[in-house]
Structures are given as structure tokens and as C-alpha cells.
Amino acid sequence: MTKTNSPAPSVITCKAAVVWKSGEPPKVEEIQVDPPKASEVRIKMLCASLCHTDFLACNGLPVPLFPRIPGHEGVGMIESVGENVTNLKEGDIVMPLYLGECGECLNCKSGRTNLCHKYPLGFSGLLLDGTSRMSIGEQKVYHHFSCSTWSEYIVIEAAYAVKVDPRVSLPHASFLCCGFTTGFGATWRDVNVVKGSTVAVLGLGAVGLGAVQGAKSQGASRIIGLDINDKKREKGEAFGMTEFINPKGSNKSISELINEATGGLGLDYVYECTGVPALLNEAIESSKVGLGTAVLIGAGLETSGEIKFIPLLCGRTVKGSIYGGVRPKSDLPTLIEKCINKEIPMDELMTHEVSLSEINKGFEYLKHPDCVKVVIKF
């Protein structure tokens, strides 16, 4: 990579994983990264990780913007800062996030959501001023959300960067940028699981394992994990799962299996972490009549599906969740502290490691039955 010598930040040429067309694999090539504008920071990435949402981005979801650089989990060191940035400096280690928290808008003041109006979850592929900081020659390259961590250098709005405690390992901090935190937060911030309650988690990837750990931390008395891969049993148990069900090969639906396991009562909370639309109905019907809550936190290639009316009419609740309701400034430090105190077995998440040039090998690893998280080392 090269950087022109100048007292002020200048354009950097570096390597990044670029997706040019929906469905095509990322290609590692040279890009140009502009200096940060007044309220932005430029980050030298140290570590990133793969999330299944990145696979969706490679396939044109949620918006088909190409060429684009995916990636929304990672950790890096601030290389330069804009003139108006006062809370961050060169050399700080930070997590680039896809949500911000101004603390002043209606949503932030409510304390009931993490979806900030001033620093929102963005789908335009551009930064807040409506432009990109990345290009290949004259070709503009789109960001993924507000970050694009599959690049050696990135530029983000400073409000989307959270400092990393040096006691947290880089891979662990990367995992907290999305998947695991999404599951954990959904049991704590978005839906506060009551102590002694019963929980099911559909899908035991990083999001599902986060939900299992969160339910355990909240004091759930029974945590049933469901996955079609028997190898996920051991992972689930490491995070606090009390029972495991593999529905593959059964002639019964997931809701039938859960209701059978609960004497027909169902469960207090059911977390749908697979992103398969048909399983939302299974999650709803697995929850208790009149009392149960189904929480939707998975995302997949299918973006719509039918929801049955009668099960909802019977007093059940459905809740959607982004990043588990976790607010970057107010809540994330609590989760980081849990990692520091070894309250969460984060080492269980990391199963594979690749370099940026091996990004497509990382996608192949995601298909392995024993894979949970793939780390990218820069």
C-alpha cells in the first residue's frame, strides 16, 4: 500500500475486497481511499470478521449497489481525523459500527431503541454527506452500511466509531460489532428476558449463540437451542444452552417439537436467528398463548413471507430487532466489560482465520458445519 507524503491527510492506495456484481465473489484489488472530511476519521484496519449479512450484501441486499466493499465487523487504528473531531485521535483503536448514538434525538432520548435519527443505519452505500470516500480510478465504490471493513483503510463518520478497551482481543472486539451482540442484546435491551423464564433459539450461529448467552445472563431457567447441525450442540452448551433439538429428519415441525417438549405450553421467548421467513411462524407458534414473544433477529436472502394471523390473535407478540437494541455508547461498554471479565466464552466463536487475499476461502469456511466465525487478519 502507498501513502503520499504530506502534512495533511492525502489519498491512500490500498487493497480491498470489491464486489462488482450481484452474486459474484469479492475480488481483492487496489482502491483509493480519500482523506476524512471534517467530522470523519480514517481507520487502518487491523482485523475484521465475516458475518452472514455480508453474504447478503454480495448478493445485492438490502439494496443492489455495485461496485461495493462489504464488511461491517472489524477493529482498526485511527490513521487520521477530520478537523472537527475532538473525541478521537490518531492511534486510537476503534470498532467501526453501522449505528451511531447522538443522545439527543427523539429515539435516543426515549431509551427504548438504538435506531438514532442523526446517525442512522444507512442503506444508501454513501456516507452522511451523500458521497463515497472510496474509488477505483474514476469509478466510485459504495460503502456497506457506514463502514466497509474488508478494506485495509476505511473512512467513517466519527460518531460511528467506538473505542476498544486494550484488554479485549482484536477478534473478540470484531465479533461484538454485529452478530454476537445482536443475539445477546435481543435478550437484554430489545426484549428483557425475565429471570426464571423459558427460551428457545432457532439457529446456533454467532447470533444464536449470543442469544443463548444473553438468556443465560438474564437468568433463564430453560434454554432450548435448535439447529440442523449436531455439531452446534457443543457450542450451544458452552454458552449456556440447557437442551438441544435437531429438527432435521423429523416429520414434526419446529413448533410441534417445542410444544411437545414443553407439555403443550410453549415458551416465554423464542428467538428466530436463521433469517428463513417460514420459521417466523414456527417461532410464533412455539411461544406461549397469551404470554409468548417471538423475536426476529435473523436475515436471509428471502426478504418477505406470510405471517399467520390466528396465532398472533391469541395474544402473542412479535418483535423485530437491529443489533439487539444495543446502543453503541450507552450499552456496548457493558458487553465489552463482560468480555474482559471472562463472563462470555468468546474464544468459542472463532473457528477459522484467513488473510484479506483469502476472503473467498473464508466464505467456503462458512459452509463448514463446525464454522462459527471467520477472522480476517490484515
Swiss-Prot record:
It is found in: Nucleus; Cytoplasm, Cytosol. InterPro entries: ADH-like_C, ADH-like_N, ADH_Zn_CS, GroES-like_sf, NAD(P)-bd_dom_sf, PKS_ER. Expressed in the leaf internal phloem-associated parenchyma (IPAP) inside the mesophyll. Its EC number is 1.1.1.-. The keyword DNA damage does not apply. Signal peptide: none annotated. NAD(+) binds at residues 52-56, 203-208, 227, 232, 274-276, 297-299, 321-323. Induction: By jasmonic acid (MeJA). Disulfide bonds: none annotated. Pfam families: ADH_N, ADH_zinc_N. One of its GO terms (cellular component) is nucleus. Zn(2+) 2 binds at C102, C105, C108, C116. It catalyses: (6E)-8-hydroxygeranial + NAD(+) = (6E)-8-oxogeranial + NADH + H(+); (6E)-8-hydroxygeraniol + NAD(+) = (6E)-8-hydroxygeranial + NADH + H(+); (6E)-8-oxogeraniol + NAD(+) = (6E)-8-oxogeranial + NADH + H(+); (6E)-8-hydroxygeraniol + NAD(+) = (6E)-8-oxogeraniol + NADH + H(+). Its cofactor is Zn(2+). Zn(2+) 1 binds at C51, H72, C178. Belongs to the zinc-containing alcohol dehydrogenase family. Class-IV subfamily. Component of the seco-iridoid and derivatives monoterpenoid indole alkaloids (MIAs, e.g. vincristine, quinine, and strychnine) biosynthesis pathway. Catalyzes two successive and reversible oxidation steps for the formation of 8-oxogeranial from 8-hydroxygeraniol. Active with 8-OH-geraniol, 8-OH-geranial and 8-oxogeraniol in the presence of NAD(+). This is 8-hydroxygeraniol oxidoreductase.
